[in-house]
Amino acid sequence: MKDSEHHHHGHNGFSKFLHKLGFGKSKGKSHKSNTSSIHERENTAAKGPASNVRPARPNVSTSSTSNEVRKSVPVGNPTVHTKTGSSSSPASKMRNTVNLQHIQAANQKTRNAEGERKVAQRRVQSDKAEANDAAMSSSAPTVDVSEGNSAAEPKITPDDSDTPRLNVDMNDKINVDEAAAKSDSKLNVDQINSTTESEKRVEKVNPNIANNPLKSPDAVAYSSETVSDEKQPTEHPVSANVPAKSEKAVCDENTKISLTNTEHYKFHSLRGDVEVVVGDLERDGRDTSLGDASVNEAAKETDVDSSRFISDEKAVTEDAMKTEHASNAPLTDERHFQFHSSEGDIEGIVGTMQRQRQSVSSYDTIVPSQFYKQKVVQNSPPSLLSTDNKIPESGSDHPSSQDNSSKASLVENSQTQSSTPRKPLPTTTSPKVNPEPHSESISDTRPSTPRKVPPSTVPKMNPKLQGGNSVTAPSTPSKVLPAMSPKVAPKFQGGRSSTAPSTPNKVLPAASAKAAPKLQEKAASFDIPNKSTIISTKSTVASPIKANENSPALKSKASFEFPKELDPDGTWNAPIPYPDANCPMAPTYRNLTSEQEEMYEEVLKYCLELKEIPVASNSSKKTDLIELERLWLTRECILRYLRATKWHVSNAKKRIVDTLVWRRHFGVNNMDPDEIQEENATGKQVLLGYDKDGRPCLYLYPARQNTKTSPLQIRHLVFSLECAIDLMPPGVETLALLINFKSSSNRSNPSVGQGKEVLNILQTHYCERLGRALVINIPWAVWGFFKLISPFIDPITREKLKFNEPLDRYVPKDQLDSNFGGSLHFEYHHEKYWPQLVELCKSRRLGILEKWRKMGSKIGTSEWDLKGGEEYVELMQQYVRPSLTNRSSSPTVTPTVNTDRQPKTLTNSADELSPQKRRVENPKPVVKDEGPVSIVEDEESTPVVTKKEDSIPVAQSTKADAGLDAENDLLPKSGSGVSETPAFSHARDVSTASFSDAVSFITADSIE
């Protein structure tokens, strides 16, 4: 008992000792249990290895000090006693005290070493910063330190404190921060990471790097003198004597957009084209190459040809020639092309056909294959080198006929010019080059001598675009375009006449004659075209063509504007550019009442004051009207909305704005034909021919549906409507809808939501656009639907609907598809039809845009004037389509109405998908394979089957049975004229939408 008490008191004293040192806390355990456990461990350790009890570690706390002790304790347990005896003996206390002192000393030594290492690192960094400051600024004061301490390691003074102190002898007690402020040097690591006055000093030294996020000891703020002495790269080089550009003209580094390619950039820099190097960054909502905006703006402001504006001095440094630029933007529009082609800028015309899936001007596709292919094929995308744009050989002047030596000299000349400062040519008389044109090529009927005008007509450069530079126009000799094939001409001319009204040319100043020989050699090697041959100097609008059948301009125009896709078997594979020559055309809305004219003026005034509209229907952000949106607001457009709203002015204003917002949000002006061409791969929507009133005919074949229900189907329908509007002649505002429901299926109609969206688009945004709807082979479901809604349809709309009637009453036979009873044997081949439709619509659209610009870009311009008016009528009357007498061996059938069997259309629709199983009382005649079969036409153009010596008039011996013919006798195996090509068979099996678009279109017009 006494022994237990003795151990208890002894251990209690040791616990108090540990507690004073901050180690041994009992954590709620009794002293008795602690004393007994320690006593047992000490006795067990004294007995030796025979004991099964494992020796324990000393009881230490989990504080930070305990962790440090635990890390520095050597292997083993230093507190375990090896001799028996009381734990309260002086020897035991001494041993514990000595062990703790050793641990503290080791920990202190470790901290001191770590502190020395950090101080040494700071000193090295400080020395580096001082060395950099001394190198950058020789006059900057330096920090003096005691000798020997600059390179030696810092000394640590012994101290009881845990934090070591750096003993640095500073001469005259100069503060480090003050020395750094005087020397404008970089601060140390601790000071640079905090927002102090040092950052303000950096801003004063060099404002260009004030916002530099780089904060490191090596990031030294250069002085303004040092920055100015260094040679900075020229991002947008101009002539050496040109004054500095304004801040607006200089492109920011983060948003800079380069010219189209390196050769393009070098060419303009070589010639000193200020407005090409300097320009706005954005136009029409997208990034463009520098300089395009300035050219267009100058042309708009002066309303004359946008010729080159070049500074008086043309010296360009060699460093500017070597500047490389990435190509991110295509040539933008026709104005840009007109600017470059007017003076023979081949590199200026060179561009990319499509970058980032953006449609660009058609002129970018022709020049690269003609000239640029020889030079930078490795830098051009594959689309530039397509075989469709190749130009056939036409004499020795054509680039394709040049030999390898001429090509080598071409590259050599271009390299020499791109590395040598040049000055423009002196004013010279253009050489008269009159190559013999191709039989179907573009011919220039005007004299090639340049015309001069007084200097007062030369436009002044916009100061914003030229950056404060005064510029004048130089002279360049005119040259003649070589002969070109008809296939290239449509893309090159965009559907406009090759002749243009004469416009005076600018007076060009003389320049140094040193550069003349080389530049002439390069121009000769390029065979640069004459600007008068390519395009009008003032506008691209075609001049009226005289009614002369032998006019070379008319022949050339017909050779490149209109497609010729007549196969040897008589099949037509292209859209038709003009309606029938006897089609009457006249301006609309000329006989308005005074009240209607007042309503129109009120809405027109509202549109003129309309500056900005929302970007979307559910958005509060507004932007200004773009050029195409203002072009859309024609006189006829405003009157259409007044008619659709029953001449209610407020409703017309609201609907016009709603349509503008929808067109912007839907992207009508930016629709890419490549995006939706898959939807029309089977020809389910075809624009072909015109009716007797000049309306373009839009054919719908629901059975040719080839895609699943998706928003892309709606975009395809909108694209077809826009193309139909482009093809409308002047004075025509509506289209004719022709629907053939043969072999269609209503198994899986589109969703109700999509049907509502289509209906809303047609009745809200394409009001007053349906002129006539002609439907054949109508199934019972559609027939019943229209019978059901017939009492609710507007009487005017009801008159537009024609079911199962002979369509030649409304459409000329030579413009009506043979599937609908016409004599035009049309078979849809996507690879032939689609590119020609896109090109024809693009040329019409560009022609309208150019006429609108020429007329002043005003809202409320008449569509009759924009689409050509009398000029269009004259061309329509002179246009003759290729002969269609070469027909296929199958007879064409003219459907007629059998009123006695009319109800059968409502009961026999179940057999629409299997025409072989039909039973019709009056089938068509079957022609046996006993001899050759051909088609002849009598005086009334009635198709007749001729076999050996017998001939049977088809139209007299058969009837169409209201569209339900026995076409099992006219399947493809027997040579039917009905288009049933294998390309459509696979698509009809996955039909997903039968007649949604047709029904929606007719219903939308009736709702209005």
UniProtKB/Swiss-Prot annotation:
Ranges for region Disordered: 1-247, 284-306, 374-514, 883-982
MF terms (GO), sorted A to Z: phosphatidylinositol binding; phosphatidylinositol transfer activity
Pfam families linked: CRAL_TRIO, CRAL_TRIO_N
A GO biological process held by the record: intermembrane phospholipid transfer
Domain of life: Eukaryota
Any Gene Ontology CC annotation: prospore membrane
Protein's name in the database: CRAL-TRIO domain-containing protein C23B6.04c
Record organism: Schizosaccharomyces pombe (strain 972 / ATCC 24843)
